[in-house]
Amino acid sequence: KLKVLNENARVPKYATDGSAAFDLVSTHGVNITPNEAKVVGTGLAFEVPEGHVMLVFSRSGHGFNNGLRLANCVGVIDSDYRGEVKAKVHNDSNTTYQVKAGERIAQAMIVPISLVKFMVVDELSSTERGEGGGGSTGKMVEDRILANLGGDFEHIKPQGDKVYAK
């Protein structure tokens, strides 16, 4: 369900039959100068079904062509929120961008969620990755490749999707 909050709002639609997300449009024009973020209203409030969440994303065309993105990267609209859905748009480019009234400014999808109960434990189960953080899975792949090749190698040099060893 959705509620139209002002006369400039547009009911969302999917751009194509294969679109995963629906477009949200601005209700008013606004200029966003370089390295500035401004809130852009959609004029819509949603009743997201219980057990679901609405995720709001930047439109790829804005990022690729205009240097625009959502200031919070991904908006999370909970099922109990009933206010206007807005997008805070950040301009990463060197030129002022003029958002026009009726312009597609973001895209959103409504997806099911899993609510979990947290259980505090003394130890977590072990995995091959363990506590390895950023970049650790790439190192694991290199180690597997070398183990499968056998022999002694002095240097690993990743290039694209290939790994060279001597």
Functional labels for PLM-detected ranges:
Residues 1-152, 159-166:
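DUTPase catalytic domain/fold
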